[in-house]
Amino acid sequence: CDRPPTSPALAGGSTNSLTLGTTGLPAVPFSFAESPRYIRSMTSHAQDATAQSVIQFWFDESSPKQWFTKDAAFDAAIQTRFGKLLDQAALGEFWGWRSDALGRLAEIIVLDQFSRNVWRDTPKSFAQDPMSLVLTQELIALGLDQGLTESQRAFAYMPLMHSESRVVQGESLRQFTALGNSNNLDFAKRHEAIIARFGRYPHRNAILGRDNTAEESAFLQTPGSSF
């Protein structure tokens, strides 16, 4: 659920369809149409300039290939440009961003996505998930997600998919169903199935110092057990 392998299709250019990696799982979890409406940010801007810089970096300056593959250079770029910002966001210092939908989305991206780049393969990469989840739930409750583009909404809902709660996974399925992208919904269903079976993501166990059950150990040997 964190960073799947490189998509052959995206490595050669943009794509509007899901491709399968060597594990048999989608190499890039989300499908984004080539239309700028799905890749570019909204014409409106976040009121806070720093929040807007996050939106611009993620949706205008970065690509799906960078979003969903392990890329040391991309991780380093985020660390250099936004590392201090991530530390501040983790302390809850950017409540002022929540005055508009894009500002709220920027805070979610910093906590839910940048954390996975900057703190990759460490427990800290998941430490901000509860805060990200609450921000997503609040965004939905206020109806502010409805004013975002499809790709923006997909990232707004990612904390639901990252959750190890069966209840929250149900909400993830509802939101990705409403979003109307069958490929994205399929990926959400794959996440939900793992949580329904294990109550957690087994591929996180080693990073978080959790012991595998015998069933989890067997599962981790199968294709598609990790995201």
Please place each PLM-identified region on the residue numbering.
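Ser/Thr/Pro/Gly-rich low-complexity, intrinsically disordered segments
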Residues: 6-7, 15-18
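Aromatic (phenylalanine/tyrosine) cluster motif
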Residues: 30-32, 38
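Short, intrinsically disordered, low-complexity terminal segments
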Residues: 6-8, 24, 30
